[in-house]
Each structure stands twice: as C-alpha cells, then as structure tokens.
C-alpha cells in the first residue's frame, strides 16, 4: 500500500531529526492514513479508500461523489484504483 491519500494526494514528507547538539539525520514524516469503507450510492456498492484525516473532512464537507470527482479530475486517483467491495 502506498502512503498517498486518494482524495487529497498528500504524500509522506522527508525531513531531519535534529538532536540537542544539532546533528541532523534524515527521517520521514508519515501521514495519518487509514483505510475507510464508504457506501457509494451512485454505483450501489461499497468502496474502500486510503485516506488521511483531511481527506475524510473533505468527504464530510463536499460529499463522496463530489470529492471523488475532484480527486479524479486533479489526478490524485483514477476509477481503476478505487477498490470496490461487493
């Protein structure tokens, strides 16, 4: 599973750990990703999405259909990458 939100397109960032003596070592800042199931009324099926917390807020605000259409239009996901359950 890639660490990319399917709604917002956010990815893990790369930065530095900085110690008390200011030595820098590379690290990754991971997203708050989780898999969430939604009932997609237009297709009459359940779908599973890999979302970050901000992506879930966007779905709550716009609705599932509008959020998916925006994500596909912006190139963050395509209809083939959306997992259909049942």
Curated annotation (Swiss-Prot):
One of its GO terms (biological process) is translation. The keyword Cell inner membrane does not apply. One of its GO terms (cellular component) is ribonucleoprotein complex. It comes from the Bacteria. Keywords: Ribonucleoprotein, Ribosomal protein. It holds the Pfam family Ribosomal_L28. InterPro entries: Ribosomal_bL28, Ribosomal_bL28/bL31-like_sf, Ribosomal_bL28_bact-type, Ribosomal_bL28_sf. Transmembrane segments: none annotated. GO terms for molecular function: structural constituent of ribosome. HAMAP family: Ribosomal_bL28. Belongs to the bacterial ribosomal protein bL28 family. NCBIfam families: L28. This is Large ribosomal subunit protein bL28. The lineage of its organism: Bacteria, Pseudomonadati, Bacteroidota, Bacteroidia, Bacteroidales.
């Amino acid at each position: 599973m890639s660490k990319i939100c399917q709604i917002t397109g956010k990815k893990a960032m790369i930065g530095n750990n900085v110690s008390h003596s200011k030595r820098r070592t590379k690290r990754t800042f991971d997203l708050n990703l989780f898999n969430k199931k939604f009932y997609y009324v237009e297709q009459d099926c359940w779908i599973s999405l890999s979302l970050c917390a901000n992506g879930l807020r966007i779905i709550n605000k716009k609705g599932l259909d509008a959020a998916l259409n925006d994500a596909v239009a912006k190139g963050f996901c395509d209809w083939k990458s959306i997992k259909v359950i049942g």
